[in-house]
Curated annotation (Swiss-Prot):
Name this polypeptide is given: HTH-type transcriptional regulator YidZ
Positions of the HTH lysR-type domain: 8-65
InterPro entries reported for this sequence: LysR-type_TF, LysR_subst-bd, Tscrpt_reg_HTH_LysR, Tscrpt_reg_YidZ, WH-like_DNA-bd_sf, WH_DNA-bd_sf, YidZ_PBP2
MF annotations from Gene Ontology: DNA binding; DNA-binding transcription factor activity
Record keywords: DNA-binding, Transcription, Transcription regulation
Record lineage: Bacteria, Pseudomonadati, Pseudomonadota, Gammaproteobacteria, Enterobacterales
Protein origin, superkingdom: Bacteria
Residues within the DNA-binding region(s): 25-44
Protein family per UniProt: Belongs to the LysR transcriptional regulatory family.
Gene responsible for this protein: yidZ
Gene3D superfamilies for the chain: Periplasmic binding protein-like II, Winged helix-like DNA-binding domain superfamily/Winged helix DNA-binding domain
NCBIfam families: PRK10216.1
Protein purpose: Involved in anaerobic NO protection.
One Pfam family named in its UniProt record: LysR_substrate
PANTHER family linked: HTH-TYPE TRANSCRIPTIONAL REGULATOR LEUO-RELATED, HTH-TYPE TRANSCRIPTIONAL REGULATOR YIDZ
Length: 319
């Protein structure tokens, strides 16, 4: 017999949603500010109402049953509609609203002014906190310290930064893909030589220390070819490497995403971009999908959904 919703405590659906997001009674209890015992009792009521276990224990936490998986999207949509309904009586620009982002620089800097204008237009009292993407950023998203991350991942099969290696709790959307190129000053002697792998490796390189590593997919590809570049300088950000590569009489080469042309135009750096001297299959391994990342619990959060859409529209021209 079909059950009536009037026989169900709707607060239990919030508990169910949080259990689906967190896959943990303890974590769901923490978010609800109740004890794990209270969440366990709520889960027991839900199991009785749906006549299904809903979750089973596994080494990775609570694993949803087929029925629970089938309800996930509908439950999320119901929660989003509920949030929108409850938000109606409130002012659309609440005081104290914060937007916290972790982003690769200069990726965010080229659109930061436009993004901040749109945020303040919609939420005049909002504050924006921007931090550089680093080794702790994914954990910061999980901890709830960051609303959205915006960073490049890697495509090399041996990379630790593959999209498929992201934690299960992280959702993402690729906004555009980029293949890095070599940046060198306009009067660099390499511009008077045949541009090939030997020329590329003849000069000293600037490396970016990315998530506590000085090497990345480029070095993996070189290793496969039995070659190695000379890293003369290691810096934390791409814009610093571009600045150093642009200095007069500097022989250093910087390898950075092609999107950096926007940054160079803004700052009028005297740099020339050359393609990495690899064949098509090797270039494919160097492709960088630039990706928005957020925690699954925020997938239907109206503020986060709006922020994601706004960033996506700003970077649409780079796709």
């Amino acid at each position: 017999m079909k059950k009536s919703i009037t026989t169900l405590d709707l607060n239990l659906l919030l508990c169910l949603q949080l259990l689906m997001q967190e896959r943990s009674v303890t974590k769901a209890a923490k978010r609800m500010n109740v004890t794990p015992s209270a969440v366990s009792k709520s889960l027991a009521k839900l199991r009785a109402w749906f006549d299904d276990p809903l979750f089973v224990n596994s080494p990775l936490g609570l694993s949803p049953t087929p029925l629970m998986v089938s309800m996930e999207q509908n439950l999320a949509e119901w929660m989003q509609m509920s949030n929108l309904l409850l938000d109606k009586p409130h002012h659309q620009t609440p005081r104290g609203l914060k937007f916290e982002l972790a982003a690769e620089s200069p990726l965010m800097m080229i659109m930061l002014n436009a993004l901040s204008k749109q945020i303040y237009q919609r939420y005049p009292q909002a504050t924006i906190k921007l931090r550089n993407w680093d080794y702790d950023s994914l954990d910061a998203i999980t901890r709830g310290e960051v609303d959205i991350g915006f960073s490049g991942r890697e495509s090399h099969p041996r990379s630790r930064e593959l999209l498929s290696s992201l934690p299960l709790a992280i959702d993402y959307e690729v906004l555009f893909s980029d293949v890095p190129c070599v940046w060198l000053r306009k009067d660099h002697p390499a511009l008077h030589e045949k541009w090939d792998l030997d020329t590329f490796l003849r000069y000293p390189h600037i490396s970016i220390c990315w998530e506590q590593s000085d090497t990345w997919a480029l070095d993996n590809v070189l290793q496969e070819l039995g070659r190695e570049r000379t890293i003369a300088m290691s810096l934390p950000e791409f814009e610093q490497s571009l600045f150093m590569a642009a200095q007069p009489d500097n022989l250093l080469l910087a390898t950075a995403p092609r999107y950096c042309q926007y940054y160079n135009q803004l700052h009028q750096l005297p740099l020339v971009a050359l393609p990495l001297p690899f064949d098509e299959s090797q270039q494919k391994k160097l492709e960088v999908p630039f990706t928005l990342l957020w925690h699954k619990r925020n997938s239907h959060n109206p503020k986060i959904v709006w922020l994601r859409d706004t960033i996506k529209n700003l970077y649409a021209s780079m796709a």
